């Protein structure tokens, strides 16, 4: 297949639309089900690069959950804990025996379930039955993987009444070293982003604390690889091999940090027993529970707790999750890693990161205020590496 006709481009009025190879060669993909759209393919090709990079860097299967050409979550295939199984809504499945790939997708989808609603999934490995069963129960636009077991493909083909988008990509495909993009009739050309993120990139530790654990190195690499394929400006919080908060596409660095930090806080607040034990009605769907939890742990909690409102969601009225209770729980969050796609211009980013349990930071460095940023890291005993490499993505 040398080209694939699309229903339309970014929007329904943008016609005609297609994907094709400029050199008239075969496309590196097969569409096994559905009819993917323009944005689906943007998500798929960016996500595929992300998960293959993650697998190469860690040796573990990887998955990502993309929305609007940025990852809402991404993870490598580490086993789930009982608490994570509960907050990712997989505790009713045989989660203790999940394949590593299924664990990776459960983590990627679970990082920010509000943003992942209607995601496009990328998988580093052949999609197995466990992973397909996870995908089947979520609201999702499609998936790309290097292959599918017969059982997994049959499960996915039943989704959306047979219209779920399933793409198989040639895992041996290597793009040309130069890439092109056209904007307003003008063609842009640049070398493809082929930077390899490895331990050597993390070796320039500029803080007093230089104790970088193997787990922290892994999480630093995970954060930087995620940022490599996230719309800039971007900041990513990572813990235990998975994104727990991605702040994408903000013009201000500190707003990236605040956004990612708030998402990381929400991820951790979901694990508090007060949230885990919310008395949901049996008829409330997972998506509705996600929405209710998001409001409950936020500042507008009375939107779900007011009389006449709580009865729609809960069997009994939950207690308010007070600001002091939330702060006390968040103070238990530790050993979080933070990556940034460009330098921190002010130390306010570090102050905000500290509130979300950040101990390890990877950023390019190069700000005129690097000394102030380092000083703030030292105040909190953080470990910070200057990579010397910017990771803008547009």
Residue ranges and their predicted role:
Residues 72-113, 244-343:
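Glycine- and Gly-Pro-enriched alpha-helical subdomains that act as flexible
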Residues 57-65, 166-169, 232-239, 269-280, ...:
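Flexible, glycine/charged-enriched surface loops at secondary-structure junctions
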Residues 119, 123-124, 137-167, 172-174, ...:
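C-terminal binding/interaction regions
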Residues 53, 229, 266-270, 355, ...:
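Conserved helix-loop functional segments at active or binding sites
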Residues 177-212, 270-282, 286-291:
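Substrate-contacting helices/loops that form the catalytic groove of nucleic-acid
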